[in-house]
Amino acid sequence: MIKNGTCPYWERDDLSECARREYIEFKFPLFILLTGMIYAFCKVFRAFYLRGKNHTNEAPEFEEQGNGNHEYARFSVLRLKSAWESRSFCNVNNRSTFDKFKKFIEGAFIVLQLTIHLYILSSMPMDNKKFFHQGFLVQMFLWILLLVVITLRLISASQSFRWVLACKRDLWAVSFYSYASLFTLSILPLRSVFIGKIKDKIMVKYIISETFIDLALLLLLSTSSIEGTRYSFLVENENKKLPPAPTVFGLLTFSRIDRLIWKAYKHCLGNADIWDLDINNKSIAILANFEMSSKKGRLLPNIICYFKAVFISQLFLAFVSSFLNFVPSLLMPRILSYVNDPKSKSWNLVSLYVSSMLVSKIIATTCRGQGLFLGEKGTMQLRTVLISNIYSKTLRRTILKDSTTSLQKNASTSFEENPDSSEAEPRKKSSRKDNSVNNVMSIDAFKVSEAMNTFYLACEAVFMTVTALMILYSLLGWSAFAGTFALLAMIPLNFWCATFYGNYQADQLILTDKRTSGISEALNSIRVIKLLAWENLFYQKIINVRDGEIRLLKKKATIFFLNHLIWFFGPTLVSAITFSVFIKFQNQTLTPTIAFTALSLFAILRTPMDQIASTVSLLIQSFISLERIQDYLNESETRKYEILEQSNTKFGFEDASMEWEAAETSFKLKNISIDFKLNSLNAIIGPTGSGKSSLLLGLLGELNLLSGKIYVPTVESRDDLEIGKDGMTNSMAYCSQTPWLISGTIKDNVVFGEIFNKQKFDDVMKSCCLDKDIKAMTAGIRTDVGDGGFSLSGGQQQRIALARAIYSSSRYLILDDCLSAVDPETALYIYEECLCGPMMKGRTCIITSHNISLVTKRADWLVILDRGEVKSQGKPSDLIKSNEFLRESINNDSKNTTHNQIDLKRSTTSKKTKNGDPEGGNSQDEVCAEVENFEETKMEGSVKFSAYKWLADYFGGLGVVFVFTSSSILIHGITLSQGFWLRYWLDTGSSGSKSTWLYRIVEGHSNIYFLLTYIIIGLVSSFLTSGKVWIAIISGTNVTKKIFAKLLSSILYAKLRFHNVTPTGRIMNRFSKDMDIIDQQLIPNFEGLSYSVVVCLWIILLIGYVTPQFLLFAIPLCALYYTVCTLYLRASRELKRIDNINISPIHQLFAEAIKGVTTIRALADERRFITQSLVAIDRSNAPFFYLNMATEWITYRVDIIGTLVLFSSSVMIIMKASYLDAGLAGILLSNAFSFTETAQWIIKVFSSVELLMSSVERIKEYTDIPSESNGYISPPANWPQTGDVELKNLSLRYSPHSSKALDNVSFKVKAGTKVGIVGRTGAGKSSIIAAIYRLSDWENGTITIDNKDIKHIPLERLRNSISCIPQDPTLFDGTVRSNLDPFDRYSDVQIYGVLSKVGLIEECDELCLIFEQEQPNFSSHKLRNRFIDLNTVVKSGGSNLSQGQRQLLCLARSMLGARNIMLIDEATASIDYISDAKIQKTIRETMKNTTILTIAHRLRSVIDYDKILVMEMGRVKEYDHPYTLISDRNTIFYRLCRQSGEFENLFELAKVSFDNKR
């Protein structure tokens, strides 16, 4: 009996009558009345005072404030609000009519309750009712308060009482709080009624009616949508689905997602089926709130500050859940005591214990679910914050090398930034590459965000550990501290393991960066790699890095094994030490009740110990990743917004000196003073490497400004500029030398966020000579350009990039050599119709070019650059007198001006003939321009068995899997035997004197024998369990090594068309996220699944063996378990696949931003790109959010099912108490306790395996892609010996549905003949090279080289036998030597020889090198040529070289090593004419006996060749000597020469060549 003064709380097995009257009926209701009344009064008074001014149905407004977290306003999320709202609208999820009707029912129940109170109060006798009257009066006042509250909630819909809306949610909260509290208070009196303790009929009726009404009211509110909560949604279109309005029941049990789960069960889900996110979970809201709460400084404190409310809530929920989880353990000794002696306690009391176990577990489950879901929601929000900040940083990051490190470098560092790079590569302090930057977003951001899930688990682990130790102390006394000290002794070992694990993780991330950088570089240059037959070279380089990763993964597995062994053996060691001390030193008897209660606590303790181990490991990984993100966010940012000065009258430089980086060898622009002529065409010319592109980048503010000033029209964001009457804004548009396109349609790339105007669009297409190409494409302007424009020819890419600049509303255009990639006819047309046509009215245009005769013809201002200095500038007519080369070019052009204008008009007219078909024919030059808009496919249904079998085959087949599962059964059998051994030991008796306990003989054995056996069983079990995990991970690592090699080989050797239609970001997703999942998550989850299934089966068999009646409960419970699992698995599978697909666009946007950051900043379009990233993040977050909700949905239900198993087991035990011994009951209950966790773990792990297997499916899909067809006949070693090439009736198309790129092409090239291939852009010129290299399979026809059909020759041999200089000069990360000779086949002399031939080094360079070697103190930084040192660094893509230097280096690479056939695809387009002439001379002199096929837009480059092949519409139109063709006015070649602007020179050169060969 528990007493409180004169009033006992508890009498034997029930609440006392005085306690019920004092507390249940008076004090507790009074507390509810006072708190509810005060809270409601405060909220109503405030709402009345404010008159509802703050209530709105719209989305919450974000005030335009901030703390300067971002340096520039254009990157502020708060400033994005207006842009976001302009493309979205608010939708409000209002309450249903049925929900509104429920309020009237609610009011009726309250009136009924008041009526019952009045009736009972008037009918009860007046004697001995001191507390009774007070209690009834308090409860009456409480119900009157609730009647007032429901009245206010009902009248809120009236216009006269709209102010109530402001406090409607608070009034609803008062009602729910009161109903829930009253129902909870009514439970114990109701129990008293059921067990017969209350016998007064009126009181019985009152208690039953009160409980029923309280329950009814609680259910009404729990199942109705929460009042006062307007869930507003910013959605992109009206078809976006909204989730159901939230209810208390739905939020607590996650039933809100029932509809989506049921829909997924009936059919496969798509993006359209996924509900939208509410405004609080939209990225714009998350980032705005984060920005307002953040301060300048490190990321970690800002994250903690922003999520502090989440952390506090999780802390509270973890405390409640942890405490309630131990209630069953606290009640277990009482139940076992009853089993041991059924007469010691009443059955009513024991049933209360069992019921309390059920209720406590349900509440603990609810709290745990809410805590975990808060963490998962925080994971999504943190991921949003990190990805958005990384993306925003990418748009702010400088394209220059970090000055903080460059200053520390030795001045003799190899070469630095290029003078003419248009899209330079961003860099990090530690030489971070763009490709590794992608890992910061795709891997590190995800790892850090996952740490949000660990906070709740960490708190729960700490609370559970402390609570368990406290209970153990109360159970075992001070001997529990012995176990505690043993537990503490393991912590340093754990941290030692964690330290090693963290170090290995950091090293692995470095190698992962290196691997993904290599893969990204290979994917971006795959065409060139195939042309050079370097697939195996890149394969080996990447595999070597991968091998280092594998070694680190195995080291991590070993550390994980040790860590697992420590914590798995911990409970056994702790229990053994505790029991020994309890018996020996405390001289106590270890009874089954105490032993198995302690074991149940130790079993529960194992969970937090495991959580601590895994949490520490994950937190270490997260902190490493967070540091990498912080390093990235700390990198230098562009200073363009500081150094650029706004001017309405001046556009140019004033005595400006600029550099790429602070190094003596860095290229510099010195003392630049240029005042570009407004509303005019300004041209910049100069030799290769003179600094033309650097000058334009300097004008955009991308270079370091050392001195002087730079004047631009504006530095404002594009969205903030006013549109003039002419539709223009004072902004700049930039077209880089290397065209940058986004993944999307042609229309998307041209319109580029501007308002679409069809007439303007058509005019731009026509002026950029794209209208005919568009007509030839099946999808027209909706044709997908592919990843970075991969599905277009180089000329088409350049013209689309130009069209983007022309279509923009910018009044100032900056064009970097945008005419070099197109043929002369097209270049002339674009120049006349676009750059000098009506589209340029009122615009200022600055253009750089090597085509001097063309661009200076109608330029108003001319700037001549050389070696970073302005040599001269002025009107072209004034510069003729002082510049002989310029004068000769312009004079030559003037002779042909009349002819050119006439021919231009004639060609423009002729292009409109032939039923509208473009004269150039097919617009697929290199690859199919009609490529479909390929969306990433989503697997449907469950993961196919073939995927599991495919993975199992790498392990050695299904037999190995069977052996592995069987070992799990055996190992857990050993684990269970430990409990039976303890029961056997206790049954034999373990008490004795303190001095003789260890040596007392029991049945022929001492107690030390039993203790050591107990420890050995635990040690063997732990070692086998941990060893099985280690073997699984090591085996999995070997498997992932094979899978990666297969995937890499499949991608590298895939047909080029696969790369044309598949975005690089999508492929990289396989190599980064999917591969990381297989590396580190899949195999441990498989192992955990097999272990959990075995444990559950053992538990069910054990309980069924002890209490066969349990099977009656087990069958429906298993059916329920199967049902919810099936529902969940289908939904989670679909949601995960959609999540996987929706992640790829984020990768794609990030990759595009890295490549095009200069263009984006030039257009001042950062805000739009940030908005696009937020939209992509929201699309990715939606399935991720509902996937997490579905995960908690199944977790909650599995926990409830597990609780029912525990409840039914306990019921069976107390029902069979007279037939069971306490030891067996203890074993059964101990295992029943762990069933909930194990069953939950099964579904979690199985669903994780299913979700993770989607990554296996995705990788398997890419390992099954068709590879290039290889030949089988190896030619002789000296093949090709002569170099004869013949094409017969060759037809080629790039996709089954596209038109032919080559149509019945036939021509023959004799050995040593030099053939120039000409024709307008898209005529099929590059397709000839593609056919010869077998980059695409042709439909029919043959190609023979030295009379051997190349279709039967192995690809590597074929491609190694031909030299090629591709259209896009592609270089790789490494050195000059590694780019020229990666296999180390040639000497330095040979390499210097080819560098000299292409003009990259001269004799004076060699003298400088000798002089430096002889006189170390001599400094020749200003004179020394960077290519002298063959170990000079070349950045990925050659980003630290000018376009011309890249082309020359590629030319040198092809000339290194004599081959009898060379194919040149527009290799000199980006170098000046003088250098071009020298190179052509070199080719003629050094390759006299080499068969050369050259694609050229510069006709001068091929005018002295042996033959000219004219292509049109994929057909051979003309094939003869240049002089023969140019002499015939009816030939296409004649027209091309006329339109080139240098007809007279071409004619003379052709005639001289013809005469010399006659």
From Swiss-Prot:
Record keyword Nucleotide-binding present: yes
Biased composition (Basic and acidic residues): 424-434
GO cellular component: fungal-type vacuole membrane
Organism of derivation: Saccharomyces cerevisiae
Domain ABC transmembrane type-1 span(s) in chain numbering: 311-621, 961-1251
Higher taxonomy: Eukaryota, Fungi, Dikarya, Ascomycota, Saccharomycotina
Official protein name in the record: ABC transporter NFT1
Region described as Disordered: spans on this chain: 410-434, 892-926
Residues in compartment: Cytoplasmic: 51-103, 152-169, 223-302, 375-449, 505-558, 606-953, 1035-1082, 1133-1199, 1244-1558
PROSITE patterns in alphabetical order: ABC_TM1F (PS50929), ABC_TRANSPORTER_1 (PS00211), ABC_TRANSPORTER_2 (PS50893)
A single GO molecular function term of this UniProt record: ATP hydrolysis activity
Entry's transmembrane regions: 30-50, 104-124, 131-151, 170-190, 202-222, 303-323, 352-374, 450-470, 482-504, 559-579, 585-605, 954-974, 1014-1034, 1083-1105, 1110-1132, 1200-1220, 1223-1243
Keyword rRNA-binding: no
